[in-house]
Amino acid sequence: SVVAISNVGVQEIQSFFGGTREYQSESSGSGIIVGQNDSELLIATNNHVVSGADTITVSFIDEASVEAQIKGTDANNDLAVVAVDLSQLSEDTLSAIKVASLGNSDDLVVGEQVVAIGNALGYGQSVTSGYVSALNREVTVDNVTASLIQTDAAINPGNSGGALLNMQGEL
């Protein structure tokens, strides 16, 4: 399952007249339920979705929203894992979600149809479709190079951390 993630933090902004002011800011992104243990639901997202957060809220497909805690981050790979306490979730929410099925990106081929699911523009879950345009695209950001999948499925602000699925529903 894909979830919406909201991040509330405080940003310090330089004033035009000198000095600084603090402003509360909110951003949104997406996450993918990748695991569950006895007490927590584990959600993978991008590090930049949760970086600098004072409060992280996860919203599920049934519109239930709960606070989440950061379990770990890897800024160089732009990855993060957040956790939601299972005791905060109703039986209805638990029955509406499931852990994502993981595929193997080495099995993808150019031209294969894919679906992108995320929290586009912070409006809640959206789905776009497209094709794998290229594999192993080398992209360098902040002196870190990654090998990525290129797709023509629309990816909008808020989709960060969301899922790119093959037609078998595998991540």
Protein language model annotation of sequence segments:
Residues 1-171:
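Serine-dependent protease modules
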